[in-house]
């Protein structure tokens, strides 16, 4: 009987051991599932954070590019402003320059008038030199081909000695500042 008792005890021990093993395995499975869930949650969180980081990096790069564009535009505006800074002054002085030209076109036999005209011519030439220093030039007209970018045709001519579309007379001088026309030349054009 003791042998039977021993067998029963051994059997009970084995069953108990198996139950413990099953419990351990089920606990490990639960722990693995919990760990897998935790990993999945952590991975999802990592993915979410990586996406947010990518989004923030993209925004940063766009803002940096926008800043560079604004900076370049500011430099271009400043350069254009510097390049054409004397345009408004030239526009204001052109009527006075026209008056000088009309006055200098007169002739007189009186010595006093000749002296005054000589002084006016000196002032006129000084203004032209100042214009030249600022990049303001007279637009060539007589003998040139008509160019609507620089000339304004106000009259037509029928001169056989001149080529077609050639400027035969200048009624008012035109001026340009570097590459920008301040005032087009008013001209008479051959047909």
Curated annotation (Swiss-Prot):
The keyword Chaperone applies. Keywords: Chaperone, Cytoplasm, Stress response. It is found in: Cytoplasm. SUPFAM superfamilies: Coiled-coil domain of nucleotide exchange factor GrpE, Head domain of nucleotide exchange factor GrpE. The keyword Zinc does not apply. Homodimer. It holds the Pfam family GrpE. GO terms for cellular component: cytoplasm. GO terms for biological process: protein folding. Belongs to the GrpE family. InterPro entries: GrpE, GrpE_coiled_coil, GrpE_head. One of its GO terms (molecular function) is protein homodimerization activity. Participates actively in the response to hyperosmotic and heat shock by preventing the aggregation of stress-denatured proteins, in association with DnaK and GrpE. It is the nucleotide exchange factor for DnaK and may function as a thermosensor. Unfolded proteins bind initially to DnaJ; upon interaction with the DnaJ-bound protein, DnaK hydrolyzes its bound ATP, resulting in the formation of a stable complex. GrpE releases ADP from DnaK; ATP binding to DnaK triggers the release of the substrate protein, thus completing the reaction cycle. The lineage of its organism: Bacteria, Bacillati, Bacillota, Bacilli, Bacillales. This is Protein GrpE.
